[in-house]
Amino acid sequence: MIILGIDEAGRGPLSGPVVAAGVILDQDKIIDGLADSKKLTEKKRQSLYQQIITHAKAYTIVEINPQQIDELNILQATLKAMHQVANNLERQFDKVLVDGNKLPNWDYNSEAIVKGDSKIIEISAASILAKVHRDNICLEHDRLYPQYGFAKHKGYPTKEHLENIKKYGVLDIHRKSYKPVQVLLNE
């Protein structure tokens, strides 16, 4: 059975896209060290990212931008991204395994697996692709807006990030539907 593993990164941050990734692994090319991306060092994630994109049978990465997140809400934006991942790889898999407890509204043979990124290697691989891709976007945001410190906090609502929004203002990359950003917009 050919498995498509799907996971996302970036539901909690105040800025940047939510990213979903899907991976179909090549059973003949073993990638050692696959695990939940949150449990790996940045260096290990980068190394595994390169191995995954080189050796996977297929993969895709989808971004939903902050404006769409604001229009849909983060759950619907995440489900939309996951749906697009499956559509991008349609007819290449027998079953979809998604990290978490919710599935998009689709007709694919699928299962949501809580903590799937720690249990299923295809989901672990997707977790790594989504996290590294999103972190790279945050590094680009840091180059564009160095005063905000995106390389450090990756868009999460840290004290530093909130202080920098207050000091320098809300950017287009911020999610305006998120309460901390709304509060700062209304000050």
UniProtKB/Swiss-Prot annotation:
Cofactor mode of binding and number, as noted: Manganese or magnesium. Binds 1 divalent metal ion per monomer in the absence of substrate. May bind a second metal ion after substrate binding.
Catalytic activity as recorded in UniProt: Endonucleolytic cleavage to 5'-phosphomonoester
InterPro entries in the record: RNase_HII, RNase_HII/HIII, RNase_HII/HIII_dom, RNaseH-like_sf, RNaseH_sf
Reported cofactor(s): Mn(2+); Mg(2+)
Protein name in the entry: Ribonuclease HII
Species whose genome carries this gene: Francisella tularensis subsp. mediasiatica (strain FSC147)
Job description of the protein: Endonuclease that specifically degrades the RNA of RNA-DNA hybrids.
Domain RNase H type-2: 1-187
Keywords, in A-Z order: Cytoplasm, Endonuclease, Hydrolase, Manganese, Metal-binding, Nuclease
Main location: cytoplasm
